[in-house]
Amino acid sequence: MLSAENNELVCRVGRGTPMGDLMRQYWIPALPSDEFPTPDCPPKRMMLLGERLVMFRDSQGRMGALEEFCPHRGASLYFGRNEEGGLRCAYHGWKFDITGKCLDTPTEQPERREKFCANIKARAYPCHEVNHMVWVYLGPRDAPPPFPAFEINTLPPDHVAHPRIMMEEANWLQNMEGDLDSAHLDWVHRRLHEDSPKPEKGIRGFWNPTGRPPVLDVVPTDYGAYYSAKRMLKDGNEWHRVNQFIFPFHTMITVGDGTVNLRSFVPLDDDHAMLISHAGHPARPLSNSEVMEQYGDLFQQVGGFIERTNDPRTYFMTKANKRNDYGRDMKLQSELMFVGIPFVGNLQDRAMTELMTNDAGEAMYDRTKEHLSASDAMIVTVRRQLINAAAKLRDEGTVPPNVDNVELDRVRCASLRYPPNADWKALSETARRVIPGQPSAAEVGLII
């Protein structure tokens, strides 16, 4: 349970809000590289933390992100021409490069254009492109902080799969909290029987070998927190799923196949967030065809994505969504799965979180109404960390350690088997570190 004040603080992400200002200290993943296939290709609208942007790849292949509205009289730069090293506004022809520098103001007389341009600048945000993803820095520093050193960002490009993205119609926090809550695996993601076959749509549901709920042990860190969700195996050993939270909105959730991953819950505004799932293999190339062979084209199994509009909040929106009960199939529910929503990406989770609203109808739950339990220990810890970090930035100007010390981001999740009462923290220390060239620790799969 949170106070109304702290709930507002931790959820709102617009410019000038404590949490929004905290997130702006970090590089933020925005759109996949293949949204911008060639130099001078058409620009794309984007929204991050409530700010409307236009992103484009210039003539040299460099990525840029500008405030959508031209500093002349506010026309949308989205309609501009991307050519010859910059984006030219369709309204009056003013032109800007990726740094926001004004290159031309053709409505001014030729003899005064150079001097006039020197006093005009579009609001521009630095971009960094790595491993099929474009990241943007929205923060206040003239020189951005170091780029995040997540393992997924440092692998060779052919070891990293194309990011899988799903739009979520709820506040970023209630979306992300599903990754901090291991107990829900035993319910919304479970199959009905241990030997239940894989459904026609989605992946096979989760199975808890003994049926006992997990016991959580949470460890706060300088970069966020990690936790073990301990379940008992039939042979009497303990199964520890060790997952990560990294400031400001990233998680790592073990899947037990030797790959490494990063899940980023990126707020577009207070009611919409993208779940960007990055996956790679430390030891060998990982092709997109291999990913499709392993997981299937899951989004297509539930109809694919809706047709995009001019609103970025429609990007990566599955056709199965809250307007059609997420493709709920009662035959699936009666025969194979505890819930009749296909286990595709975060579709089942979205059915739980997107309908959590406050009295104003926003998809931002009123957490004063909650009744938390021991299984919510990681959620409680991370909320406290986020609130404290946002308050320290607001009141003291202190940024979290991993803004500048990006080596703190060099962590992994793991799925491990230990004898009863083992010291899981000590035993998992190596598994939780990035060891270049070695697969992630997966002594126990996800049992799906």
Q: Which role does the model predict for each range below?
A:
Residues 1-83, 113-139, 143:
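N-terminal pre-ligand scaffold of iron-sulfur
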Residues 37-38, 62, 135, 141-448:
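C-terminal catalytic domain of Rieske-type non-heme iron oxygenases
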Residues 56, 66, 90, 105, ...:
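Beta-strand residues in well-ordered beta-sheet regions across diverse protein folds
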Residues 71, 87-90, 103, 128:
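Cys/His/Pro-rich metal-binding microdomains
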Residues 72, 92, 184:
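Histidine-centered divalent metal-coordination motifs
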Residues 81-86, 100-104:
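Short cysteine/histidine-rich zinc-coordinating motifs and their immediately flanking basic loops
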Residues 91-102, 125:
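Hydrophobic or amphipathic alpha-helical targeting/insertion segments
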Residues 100-117:
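Glycine-rich loop(s) and the adjacent beta-strand/alpha-helix scaffold that form part
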